[in-house]
């Protein structure tokens, strides 16, 4: 039995190497060569424009609304807060049944927010009730591991990723799981939906990223290259590429059409993992959130670092760029959110 397993293991390694070689052969140029004539970005200096105070404990997650004004944040204090980023006012403060929350999401319509975590449940809250109060409109149980990330497709469907090594698509109206996306061999830590919401990418503790089709539930592509857990993943604004952040202290850029990694963002001085990533609206800048409390700003084309967002007194746990590209928000264990531009 063990001999058979070893033979199969060797065979899979050989096949993986063949795929690697085939991909290499198809790569006719490198990102550095292709961008050699492009001007460098120059130093990026962002200032804190707003500080959102109201949480009483560590902030674990945040997500911008599609109006680029409101945002939602989730904290260990057991509250989900919807903020007006212009005025810094709290629009809603929603008490949660479980304070062990790891992710939150704002629906594209602005009608709903969602959250989940160690309770293994994705809870959906309606912000537009007739009575004016916010209430749980649906709880989606079904994952057998913690909920690591959730993102709305529309008002009636949401995609979740979980520590049970799967992702799922849910029908919010019925509360049923309509599709299960299986194939990762480690906890799925993060997901990102494409701009047209037809596909999503996931990053997992098996050090691979996968591209899934929302409509047929199939894994279309698998991307390897990282040497440790992938903690964060985000689509490039045009939907043809995505970036990942990993415990191997690198961010990487994968091109979907080239079917391979085309860029790596690392520095000898950076030895800690990355836990969230986000692109600027143009896609020229990549923001990475590191375990040493810092946020580095990378020039995507030149693969060089061009600035740091420093201003929190504790670990930065989450970051997000507005849809219109006008601002970046960071959330921290110091209980504050900061908005930069």
From Swiss-Prot:
Q: What are the alphabetically sorted keywords of the record?
A: Repeat, Transducer, WD repeat
Which residues are listed as membrane-spanning? Answer: none
* InterPro entries in the cross-refs: G-protein_beta_WD-40_rep (IPR020472), Gprotein_B (IPR001632), Guanine_nucleotide-bd_bsu (IPR016346), WD40/YVTN_repeat-like_dom_sf (IPR015943), WD40_repeat_CS (IPR019775), WD40_repeat_dom_sf (IPR036322), WD40_rpt (IPR001680)
The record's WD repeats, renumbered to this chain, cover 54-84, 96-126, 142-171, 183-213, 225-255, 269-299, 311-341
Gene3D superfamilies noted in UniProt: YVTN repeat-like/Quinoprotein amine dehydrogenase
List this protein's GO terms for biological process.
signal transduction
Task: Respond yes or no to whether keyword Repeat is given for this record.
Answer: yes
> What task does this protein carry out?
Guanine nucleotide-binding proteins (G proteins) are involved as a modulator or transducer in various transmembrane signaling systems. The beta and gamma chains are required for the GTPase activity, for replacement of GDP by GTP, and for G protein-effector interaction.
Query: Which family does the UniProt entry place this protein in?
Result: Belongs to the WD repeat G protein beta family.
Kindly state the subunit structure of this protein.
Answer: G proteins are composed of 3 units, alpha, beta and gamma.
Name this protein carries in UniProt: Guanine nucleotide-binding protein subunit beta
The organism is Lymnaea stagnalis
């Amino acid at each position: 039995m063990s001999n058979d397993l070893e033979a199969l293991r060797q065979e899979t390694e050989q096949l993986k190497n063949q795929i690697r070689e085939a991909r290499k052969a198809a790569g006719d140029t490198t990102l550095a060569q292709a961008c050699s004539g492009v001007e460098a970005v120059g130093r990026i200096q962002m200032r804190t424009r707003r500080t959102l105070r109201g949480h009483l404990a560590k902030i674990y997650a945040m997500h911008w609304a599609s109006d680029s004004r409101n945002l939602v944040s989730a904290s260990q204090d057991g509250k989900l807060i919807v903020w007006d980023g212009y005025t810094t006012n709290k629009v809603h403060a929603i008490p949660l049944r479980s304070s062990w929350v790891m992710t939150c999401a704002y629906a594209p319509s602005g009608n709903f927010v969602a959250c989940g975590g160690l309770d293994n449940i994705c809870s959906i809250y309606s912000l537009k009730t007739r009575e004016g109060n916010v209430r749980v409109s649906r709880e989606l149980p079904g994952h057998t591991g913690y909920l690591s990330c959730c993102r709305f497709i529309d008002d009636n469907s949401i995609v979740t990723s979980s520590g049970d090594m799967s992702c799922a698509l849910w029908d919010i109206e019925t509360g049923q799981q309509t599709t299960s996306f299986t194939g990762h061999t480690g906890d799925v830590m993060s997901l990102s939906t494409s701009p047209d919401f037809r596909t999503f990418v996931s990053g997992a503790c098996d050090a691979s990223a996968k591209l899934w089709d929302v409509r047929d539930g199939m894994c279309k592509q698998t991307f390897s290259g990282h040497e440790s857990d992938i903690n964060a993943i985000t689509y490039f604004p045009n939907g043809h590429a995505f970036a990942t952040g990993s415990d191997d202290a690198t961010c990487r850029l994968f091109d979907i059409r080239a079917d391979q990694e085309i860029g790596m963002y690392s520095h000898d001085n950076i030895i800690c993992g990355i836990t969230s990533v986000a692109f600027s609206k143009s896609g020229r800048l990549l923001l990475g959130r590191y375990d040493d409390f810092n946020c580095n700003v990378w020039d995507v084309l030149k693969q060089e670092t061009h600035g740091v967002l420093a201003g929190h007194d504790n670990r930065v746990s989450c970051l997000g760029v507005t849809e219109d590209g006008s601002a970046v928000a960071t959330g921290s264990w110091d209980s504050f959110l900061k908005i930069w531009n």
